[in-house]
Amino acid sequence: MMLHIPGVLTNAQVAQCRELLDAAHWVDGNATSGAQSALAKRNRQLPEGSPVARAVGDAIQDALARHALFFSAALPLKVFPPLFNRYAGGETFGTHVDNAIRLLRGTDFRVRSDLSATLFLEEPDAYDGGELCVEDTYGVHRAKLPAGDLVLYPASSLHHVTPVTRGERVASFFWIQSMVRDDGDRTLLFQLDTQIQALSAEKGAKDPMVISLTGIYHNLLRKWADA
């Protein structure tokens, strides 16, 4: 499942993040690449240990913790600290798949990458190209979202970023280890939760059907979740 999650950051929060990011020191993006990704990657990135990356990443994680749609879709167990990249002047990232396990350098913190996320930090009309293209059995899905919006997709997907030919694309990217490892199971839970929320809004939280479906949701989560 590929999902557009709007409004993770407000316009004011995006502006605050960009003020810090634009003044930071950026390095060759291959500093964090695996061997296969390094063959396809041409962009710039903030070093993982950068104080700016930590500060802006903390702000993003705080926003994610308050975002009900993100929690419902991802069911996060662990989130890898957000990283940051920028593309300009024809920079691109060719087709690749993300590493299955991400290790935070200098620590024993590990994340199984069940889901990948890209949070856009530049408005789409400010640059040409820079589309995130995610492949699945139904074809190629493209994302180029407003600043502050996030796209979530299975980390097992082949994906690429098209060349940026005008302006600059700035984004945060990170990985999520979900409580529910299987993408199909996680998607079913998300669909069920969405319908429960809609029914609750229509009939009220005390409606017998809402209570029954909520019980089914939690029993499925109990069956499938690692916690």
Swiss-Prot record:
<keyword id="KW-0479">Metal-binding</keyword>
<protein>
    <recommendedName>
        <fullName>PKHD-type hydroxylase Bamb_4192</fullName>
        <ecNumber>1.14.11.-</ecNumber>
    </recommendedName>
</protein>
<feature type="binding site">
    <location>
        <position position="169"/>
    </location>
    <ligand>
        <name>2-oxoglutarate</name>
    </ligand>
</feature>
<keyword id="KW-0560">Oxidoreductase</keyword>
<dbReference type="GO" id="GO:0006879">
    <property type="term" value="P:intracellular iron ion homeostasis"/>
</dbReference>
<dbReference type="GO" id="GO:0006974">
    <property type="term" value="P:DNA damage response"/>
</dbReference>
<keyword id="KW-0408">Iron</keyword>
<dbReference type="GO" id="GO:0005506">
    <property type="term" value="F:iron ion binding"/>
</dbReference>
<dbReference type="InterPro" id="IPR023550">
    <property type="entry name" value="PKHD_hydroxylase"/>
</dbReference>
<dbReference type="Pfam" id="PF13640">
    <property type="entry name" value="2OG-FeII_Oxy_3"/>
</dbReference>
<keyword id="KW-0847">Vitamin C</keyword>
<feature type="binding site">
    <location>
        <position position="98"/>
    </location>
    <ligand>
        <name>Fe cation</name>
    </ligand>
</feature>
<feature type="binding site">
    <location>
        <position position="96"/>
    </location>
    <ligand>
        <name>Fe cation</name>
    </ligand>
</feature>
<dbReference type="GO" id="GO:0031418">
    <property type="term" value="F:L-ascorbic acid binding"/>
</dbReference>
<dbReference type="GO" id="GO:0016706">
    <property type="term" value="F:2-oxoglutarate-dependent dioxygenase activity"/>
</dbReference>
<dbReference type="InterPro" id="IPR005123">
    <property type="entry name" value="Oxoglu/Fe-dep_dioxygenase_dom"/>
</dbReference>
<feature type="binding site">
    <location>
        <position position="159"/>
    </location>
    <ligand>
        <name>Fe cation</name>
    </ligand>
</feature>
<dbReference type="InterPro" id="IPR041097">
    <property type="entry name" value="PKHD_C"/>
</dbReference>
<dbReference type="InterPro" id="IPR044862">
    <property type="entry name" value="Pro_4_hyd_alph_FE2OG_OXY"/>
</dbReference>
<dbReference type="InterPro" id="IPR006620">
    <property type="entry name" value="Pro_4_hyd_alph"/>
</dbReference>
<feature type="domain" description="Fe2OG dioxygenase">
    <location>
        <begin position="78"/>
        <end position="178"/>
    </location>
</feature>
<keyword id="KW-0223">Dioxygenase</keyword>
<dbReference type="Pfam" id="PF18331">
    <property type="entry name" value="PKHD_C"/>
</dbReference>
